[in-house]
Regions:
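N-terminal glycine-/serine-/threonine-rich phosphate-binding loop
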Residues: 38-91
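General beta-strand structural signal in soluble alpha/beta enzymes
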Residues: 49, 70-75, 89-93, 118, ...
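A short, charged helix-loop
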Residues: 139-162, 166-205, 267-272
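Long, structured protein-protein interaction/assembly regions in large complexes
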Residues: 236-273
């Protein structure tokens, strides 16, 4: 854990928070748990949720329901929310199109992406939202199909191809692009952090928090696409690497420098004893 002073210095230097009052916090959690902030806050009034991994999703859904947010969903996620006894609107009811092509096309529709990408301070966008009856979507929660795990399992090519997420990756990129107005939670790894944000902010997020989550979103999308490229690439002398969760070292090449290790340290050596 970091001390309050250490945490505030780090977060202020990265423009994530201002005037934060915290006793201590986990080192991996970079979010202000105090509502005092210099930025404009946006309250979440609507959410689109479409996830593969639902671990830890329930408390988020319950919190959104408690703050009277409208929840849109599809497929298995929609069933999950219904089973919690929480009202949910099917995306198909918004688009007037069913899930088609064996589930390959569910959320790819202007009424979905218009709700995510509209600029709320742009008069033309506001007018078109009204003209085409597009619902506002303040929050997008996505967890992608497990492409890398499917490849690692030795699955055949047909099964691997079906685990290339199209709608999910599009939702992630759209919401991240419009972080000024839209919150993106791009993977199960960010569920806990996001829940802390809205609990601390009474259902609202700051522009710093939204931009921070957008950076996480583009990491998820770039890592995902790199894995897909490496699977398909059999000829070009190109290999794309994206490694997360670097381990902090005591110091870098010199004592005054910072050092990190990325990768699987155990895989580099053969254990003798």
């Amino acid at each position: 854990k970091w001390s309050s002073n250490q945490l505030q210095l780090y977060l202020k230097s990265h423009k994530i928070i201002y005037n934060c009052e915290i006793n201590s916090i986990k080192k991996t959690t970079f979010v202000c748990l105090n509502k005092s902030t210099m930025s404009t806050e946006k309250t979440i009034q609507s959410a689109l949720i479409s996830v593969f991994d639902k671990t830890g999703l329930e408390p988020i859904v319950r919190q959104l329901h408690q703050q009277n947010a409208t929840i849109y969903s599809t497929g298995g996620t929609e069933d999950f929310i219904k089973n919690l006894g929480i009202p949910v609107i099917a995306v198909e009811d918004v688009t007037s199109y069913p899930s088609i092509l064996g589930g390959r096309v569910k959320t790819l529709h202007p009424k979905v992406f218009g709700g995510i990408l509209n600029r709320q301070d742009n008069a033309t966008d506001v007018a078109q939202m009204k003209e085409y009856d597009i619902p506002q979507i303040d929050l997008v929660i996505v967890d992608l199909y497990p492409f890398e795990k499917t490849v690692a399992s030795g699955a055949n090519e047909a099964d691997v191809i079906e685990k290339i997420d199209i709608g999910g990756i599009s939702l992630i990129r759209a919401a991240a692009k419009n972080f000024k107005d839209t919150v993106i939670v791009p993977s199960v790894d960010e569920y806990e952090l996001f829940l802390e944000m809205i609990l601390a902010g009474n259902g609202a997020t700051t522009i710093e928090q939204r931009k921070y989550l957008a950076s996480k979103a583009f990491h998820v999308s770039s890592h995902y696409d790199a894995a897909i490229f490496n699977y398909f690439n059999n000829e070009d002398a190109i290999f794309k690497v994206s490694i997360a969760n670097g381990q902090s070292l005591r110091y870098g090449e010199n004592p005054h420098q910072k050092g990190f290790f990325f990768g699987d340290f155990d895989a580099m050596f053969t254990k003798l004893h």
